[in-house]
Amino acid sequence: MQVQSLERTFVDKIFAICDYYLSRNTIRNSRHIYDISRILKKIDIFDLNLKLLIENVRNERKQNKTCLSAQDDANVQELLKKIVSTNFFKQDYNETTSKLLAKNVNYDDAIKSLQIIINSGLFAQS
């Protein structure tokens, strides 16, 4: 059985939350914020190979027109900023995701992971 790397899962989840933001779909999707916050503790976001992986994943996802954040005109860095500043996933996180967690991680703590990613510039020009 082949297992996807944490880095690939991380990148896919970033694109996924951006797609959900662009399609205005929060329902049961805030779980990705929690997942990202946990994965971020296990990977090195300054690994140069991660930038290449992001580019490869974007090119792969771009083929699917429903993957809005992978299209050429999408700016993932800016989308992440909007997700944080608008608290787009907060209600769903508090009403759905937080009830599913074995270890409680509140929204404000989970969303800090996106701010770390924004500050790193990892998705700048992506």
Predicted regions and their residues:
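Structured mid-to-C-terminal alpha-helical surface segments
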Residues: 1-126
